[in-house]
Amino acid sequence: MSESPKKVIVGMSGGVDSSVSAWLLQQQGYQVEGLFMKNWEEDDGEEYCTAAADLADAQAVCDKLGIELHTVNFAAEYWDNVFELFLEEYKAGRTPNPDILCNKEIKFKAFLEFAAEDLGADYIATGHYVRRADVNGKSRLLRGLDGNKDQSYFLYTLGHEQIAQSLFPVGELEKPQVRKIAEDLGLVTAKKKDSTGICFIGERKFRDFLGRYLPAQPGKIITVDGDEIGEHQGLMYHTLGQRKGLGIGGTKDGSEDPWYVVDKDVENNVLIVAQGHEHPRLMSVGLIAQQLHWVDREPFTGTLRCTVKTRYRQTDIPCTINALDDDRIEVIFDEPVAAVTPGQSAVFYSGEVCLGGGIIEQRLPLTV
């Protein structure tokens, strides 16, 4: 008697990647069902329409593939475990990455538990562009095959146990192949553009959105030489390396170079700027990271040579990691790096393998 097929619950977002993931798993012989997560209580008509359209697209794809679609509301979990922390970080003058938190707390925790306990799933699956490989009895996280779409940066908090329970079907494909499969199948999501913006907050204007929850506090914009040249509307709206939206022109002492944010003085509510994207004040020789997560869940000790990304889509930076204590490491870059931003994540790699990462606590500036 043959074994019954393993049951997989696919996180259906209403996008093309999760749609094709569901079909690929069907082809591989799994018993597939979909799940649409509602993680935000809409407070305006436009956002409600977007969420409703995504649900309708997810339902249409599931109908086409002949699979059941479940819906679940994780809005309370999202607010408590993602959004409140996100606001706290902004208040402290840092720039958090809520997509990483959302994957940690919602997609690979709340969703994983719900799928296993309430729906009897053997696995969950998502449309992330990553791969998994089992080495010495532990699941490893690998970069997606499509280097342009690789999303391992956003999944570094996952442990080997979570990866072992997760499938990533499109991680073995390139994006154009995924779109072609969707077109050939006649899926409504085939030509739908990729979502941008904060995970579940969607496409709405970020500045307007943040202003609803945190009161803006205008303050001075000063140059690295101490000259006051403008006013900012709130430090939370600015991040290191930012060029647009400063509201100041380009010329000073004959230089036409644009202004960039090089530092934030949170205590005095001052934004510090300099001209040129390679200004020494913007460069760092390394960083201190905390809140570490290693995929193999083994504590890190000693020293390691590897590469690091300090933001998504960045070219890998060769570096040396030194353990400071149980939950802090020092990272020294081989070459100075621009716009290393506290609150963002530093994610480490050995070749194709994502080792883990941590939150950038402070940068080690090239010039003090």
From Swiss-Prot:
<keyword id="KW-0694">RNA-binding</keyword>
<keyword id="KW-0963">Cytoplasm</keyword>
<dbReference type="InterPro" id="IPR004506">
    <property type="entry name" value="MnmA-like"/>
</dbReference>
<feature type="binding site">
    <location>
        <position position="37"/>
    </location>
    <ligand>
        <name>ATP</name>
    </ligand>
</feature>
<dbReference type="GO" id="GO:0103016">
    <property type="term" value="F:tRNA-uridine 2-sulfurtransferase activity"/>
</dbReference>
<feature type="region of interest" description="Interaction with tRNA">
    <location>
        <begin position="149"/>
        <end position="151"/>
    </location>
</feature>
<dbReference type="InterPro" id="IPR046884">
    <property type="entry name" value="MnmA-like_central"/>
</dbReference>
<feature type="active site" description="Nucleophile">
    <location>
        <position position="102"/>
    </location>
</feature>
<dbReference type="GO" id="GO:0005524">
    <property type="term" value="F:ATP binding"/>
</dbReference>
<keyword id="KW-0808">Transferase</keyword>
<dbReference type="GO" id="GO:0000049">
    <property type="term" value="F:tRNA binding"/>
</dbReference>
<comment type="subunit">
    <text>Interacts with TusE.</text>
</comment>
<dbReference type="GO" id="GO:0002143">
    <property type="term" value="P:tRNA wobble position uridine thiolation"/>
</dbReference>
<comment type="function">
    <text>Catalyzes the 2-thiolation of uridine at the wobble position (U34) of tRNA(Lys), tRNA(Glu) and tRNA(Gln), leading to the formation of s(2)U34, the first step of tRNA-mnm(5)s(2)U34 synthesis. Sulfur is provided by IscS, via a sulfur-relay system. Binds ATP and its substrate tRNAs.</text>
</comment>
<dbReference type="InterPro" id="IPR014729">
    <property type="entry name" value="Rossmann-like_a/b/a_fold"/>
</dbReference>
<feature type="binding site">
    <location>
        <begin position="11"/>
        <end position="18"/>
    </location>
    <ligand>
        <name>ATP</name>
    </ligand>
</feature>
<dbReference type="InterPro" id="IPR023382">
    <property type="entry name" value="MnmA-like_central_sf"/>
</dbReference>
<keyword id="KW-0820">tRNA-binding</keyword>
<feature type="active site" description="Cysteine persulfide intermediate">
    <location>
        <position position="199"/>
    </location>
</feature>
<protein>
    <recommendedName>
        <fullName>tRNA-specific 2-thiouridylase MnmA</fullName>
        <ecNumber>2.8.1.13</ecNumber>
    </recommendedName>
</protein>
<dbReference type="InterPro" id="IPR046885">
    <property type="entry name" value="MnmA-like_C"/>
</dbReference>
<dbReference type="GO" id="GO:0005737">
    <property type="term" value="C:cytoplasm"/>
</dbReference>
<keyword id="KW-0067">ATP-binding</keyword>
<dbReference type="Pfam" id="PF20259">
    <property type="entry name" value="tRNA_Me_trans_M"/>
</dbReference>
<keyword id="KW-0819">tRNA processing</keyword>
<feature type="site" description="Interaction with tRNA">
    <location>
        <position position="128"/>
    </location>
</feature>
<comment type="similarity">
    <text>Belongs to the MnmA/TRMU family.</text>
</comment>
<dbReference type="Pfam" id="PF03054">
    <property type="entry name" value="tRNA_Me_trans"/>
</dbReference>
<feature type="region of interest" description="Interaction with tRNA">
    <location>
        <begin position="311"/>
        <end position="312"/>
    </location>
</feature>
<feature type="region of interest" description="Interaction with target base in tRNA">
    <location>
        <begin position="97"/>
        <end position="99"/>
    </location>
</feature>
<keyword id="KW-1015">Disulfide bond</keyword>
<dbReference type="Pfam" id="PF20258">
    <property type="entry name" value="tRNA_Me_trans_C"/>
</dbReference>
<feature type="site" description="Interaction with tRNA">
    <location>
        <position position="344"/>
    </location>
</feature>
<feature type="disulfide bond" description="Alternate">
    <location>
        <begin position="102"/>
        <end position="199"/>
    </location>
</feature>
<feature type="binding site">
    <location>
        <position position="127"/>
    </location>
    <ligand>
        <name>ATP</name>
    </ligand>
</feature>
<keyword id="KW-0547">Nucleotide-binding</keyword>
